[in-house]
């Protein structure tokens, strides 16, 4: 059995989703949600809180692999910079925990989950709900994105095993 943590990095909100793949290939959603940092705090403190809360998730769930969404911004340099800083904290925390890290672009995630690179948030949430057998679509969007990136990794993993 393998547990994968999916991460959608951000300073204000970092989405997380944990999936378990059983030896028979069944997938189980273990947990999902967001790590939220208070806007009133200085950036360094917010990044520290992100690291501490991500470390707590790792300690609780003991994932063996991680899937992190690569982020591309073309319009807002300030947002891109802060997300990049959060991504750095996420990657370092995962690396220090000895977790294998895999990265996926938003296009790869949309194609893997919805079969269409231009899928919108609603389409993605509907597919995640169906693929994981959830009662409700995952919310908020950041948590849904994190589940989607974890699911993308598990699909990619299966394809790689078939090709081996």
Regions found by a protein language model. Give the residues of each.
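Phosphate- and other anionic-substrate recognition elements at nucleic-acid/protein interfaces
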Residues: 1-164
């Amino acid at each position: 059995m393998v547990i994968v943590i999916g991460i959608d990095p951000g300073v204000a909100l970092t989405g997380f989703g944990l999936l378990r793949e059983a030896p028979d290939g069944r997938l189980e959603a273990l947990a999902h949600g967001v790590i939220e940092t208070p806007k009133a705090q200085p950036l360094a403190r917010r990044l520290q809180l992100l690291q501490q809360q991500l470390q707590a998730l790792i300690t609780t769930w003991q994932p063996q692999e991680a899937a992190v969404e690569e982020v591309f911004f073309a319009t807002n340099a300030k947002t891109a910079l802060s997300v990049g800083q959060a991504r750095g904290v996420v990657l370092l925390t995962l690396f220090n925990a000895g977790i294998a890290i895999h990265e996926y672009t938003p296009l790869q995630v949309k194609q893997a989950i919805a079969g269409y690179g231009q899928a919108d948030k609603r389409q993605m949430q509907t597919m995640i709900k169906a693929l994981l057998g959830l009662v409700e679509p995952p919310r908020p969007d950041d948590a849904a994105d994190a589940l989607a990136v974890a699911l993308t990794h598990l699909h990619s993993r299966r394809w790689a095993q078939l090709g081996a």
